[in-house]
């Protein structure tokens, strides 16, 4: 064999090896691209306290590992803090709304609760348990609770305050429902990925309060679906940040902004009209027409109220070709969310069949 032919032979081996490596790289790139496409990014949006964090907790219960005993124990302190926060809010409101205590000893109880530094609460001591129970049973405090739309009070207040005896027992372990009801304002961005039918659903929850929204911007890339939560029960409430602005008007303004963002042109929009259970209770004594004069349906009718609210949001969509998928939900009800998310998952997969190699 001549030197030239040997060199040609070596060269062709090198070329072959180089081609093989290139082919491997191309193959890996295609695989990476396909795998990236098999991840769906779901962005949870909505104003503060619309139920986004509760929705993520439900995904962990329904499609993830749920909450172990140790996980639940980690919520104990937060449950106690939620109880103190709720009673402090009512004690302050009693003063603002000039409501009198029926039982004289509750003035001292109110003072005792007021002086607690909630962030330092880690236990639920006997004297505080008694003070909170006595306050909650006071007709004055009950009147204050009935006027809760006039001040800021967590939706979970009644749930916890009517169950103080159970929560105050030695060795108390929060139930799944206790965990779902805990209110902790979301600061920053929380991601929860879960695997369904070989596809990763990456749910991203961003803080709903105004100060948190500027952090959203970098979440806007490659969003498969926008899941926008509206609290149906907020039609008569004002904002945490501004007490002369209606919460539902703020929610409408945010929804209008979101659906017209160019980033979301190709993202499907799913509207969750949440807290339907609270609406059913509230509509009996707080009339929708007092806050939205254009409502001409019957009073005390939850169905008419929610259909009106749905239409208000759907009418904000400027693009007649874009479908807005909607569901009425109760984020604290695991079975309701299981049922609704099964439908949502089917919708999302149907819309992404070709792109995700599902056909």
Curated annotation (Swiss-Prot):
GTP binds at residues 46-53, 180-183, 274-277, 331. SMART domains: G_alpha (SM00275). A lipid is attached at residues 9-10 (S-palmitoyl cysteine). Residues 329-334 are annotated as: G5 motif. It comes from the Eukaryota. Residues 38-359 form the G-alpha domain. Residues 41-54 are annotated as: G1 motif. InterPro entries: Gprotein_alpha_Q, Gprotein_alpha_su, GproteinA_insert, P-loop_NTPase. It is a lipid-anchor. One of its GO terms (cellular component) is cytoplasm. It is found in: Cell membrane; Cytoplasm. GO terms for molecular function: alkylglycerophosphoethanolamine phosphodiesterase activity; enzyme regulator activity; G protein activity; G protein-coupled receptor binding; G-protein beta/gamma-subunit complex binding; GTP binding; GTPase activity; metal ion binding. Residues 201-210 are annotated as: G3 motif. Its main location: membrane. Mg(2+) binds at residues 53, 186. GO terms for biological process: action potential; cellular response to pH; cranial skeletal system development; developmental pigmentation; endothelin receptor signaling pathway; G protein-coupled receptor signaling pathway; heart development; ligand-gated ion channel signaling pathway. Residues 270-277 are annotated as: G4 motif. It catalyses: GTP + H2O = GDP + phosphate + H(+). Keywords: Cell membrane, Cytoplasm, GTP-binding, Hydrolase, Lipoprotein, Magnesium, Membrane, Metal-binding, Nucleotide-binding, Palmitate, Transducer. G proteins are composed of 3 units; alpha, beta and gamma. The alpha chain contains the guanine nucleotide binding site. Interacts with RGS22. Interacts with NTSR1. Belongs to the G-alpha family. G(q) subfamily. This is Guanine nucleotide-binding protein subunit alpha-11.
């Amino acid at each position: 064999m001549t030197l030239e032919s040997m060199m040609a032979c070596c060269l062709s081996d090198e070329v072959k090896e180089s081609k093989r490596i290139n082919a491997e790289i191309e193959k890996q790139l295609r695989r990476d691209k396909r795998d990236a496409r098999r991840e769906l990014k779901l962005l949870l949006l909505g104003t503060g306290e619309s139920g986004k964090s509760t929705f993520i907790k439900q995904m962990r219960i329904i499609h993830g590992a749920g909450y172990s005993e140790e996980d639940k124990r980690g919520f104990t302190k937060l449950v106690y803090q939620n109880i103190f926060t709720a009673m402090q809010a009512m004690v302050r409101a009693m003063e603002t709304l000039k409501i009198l205590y029926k039982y004289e000893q509750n003035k001292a109880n109110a003072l005792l609760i007021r002086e607690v530094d909630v962030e330092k609460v880690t236990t639920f001591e006997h004297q505080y348990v008694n003070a909170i129970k006595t306050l909650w049973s006071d007709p004055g405090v009950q009147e204050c609770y009935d006027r809760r739309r006039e001040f800021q009070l967590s939706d979970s207040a009644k749930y916890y305050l009517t169950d103080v005896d159970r929560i105050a027992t030695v060795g108390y372990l929060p139930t799944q429902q206790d965990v779902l009801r805990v209110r902790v304002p979301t600061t920053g961005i929380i991601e929860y990925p879960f695997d369904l039918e070989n596809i990763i659903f990456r749910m991203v929850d961003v803080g709903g309060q105004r100060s948190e929204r500027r952090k959203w911007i970098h979440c806007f890339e490659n969003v498969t679906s926008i899941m926008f939560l509206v609290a149906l029960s907020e039609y008569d409430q004002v904002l945490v940040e501004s007490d002369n602005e209606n919460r539902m008007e703020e929610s409408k303004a945010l929804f209008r902004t979101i659906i017209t963002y160019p980033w979301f042109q190709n993202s499907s929009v799913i509207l969750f009209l949440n807290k339907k259970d609270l609406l059913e209770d509230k509509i009996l004594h707080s009339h929708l027409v007092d806050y939205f004069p254009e409502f001409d349906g019957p009073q005390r009718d939850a169905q008419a109220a929610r259909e009106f609210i749905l239409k208000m949001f759907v009418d904000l969509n400027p693009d007649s070709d874009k479908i807005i998928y909607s569901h009425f939900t109760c984020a604290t009800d695991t079975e309701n969310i299981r049922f609704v998310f099964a439908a949502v998952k089917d919708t999302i997969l149907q819309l992404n069949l070709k792109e995700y190699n599902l056909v």
